[in-house]
């Protein structure tokens, strides 16, 4: 695990905007888009629909959602937030009109070893599963940013996560502790 963590982080990535290239300094480094890809794709789909004149809709990209306009009945889109301790139940329902909602959680993808549950979300600083928060839902104007924030906040402790979120005043969150 220690060797894997050595290959994590932006400091070993060289971006060249002139050549439009990315260079990974260390052999074995990889780039994963899991924390941003769904949100980015969701936003792009919404933008394409808006460009085609579609006045209202909801795009669901693997649970990351982007909305615009209103439902045919004139009401906001109602998005259910799953209760991580009872996944068959909703914790809350949030109305969205021109917003996005994303969730990073450990309640759907995990492994149980020796009776202990481990998240699929890894803390890049330690190389071990993230602990402390079992679910983080972020709401805001952009699914890509919300997706990045929910993934980042899930890896932090609650207080540190709330401090980070203060830098993004257009976004709010629902944090559920383990």
Model-derived features: positions:
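Mature catalytic core of soluble alpha/beta enzymes
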Residues: 1-178
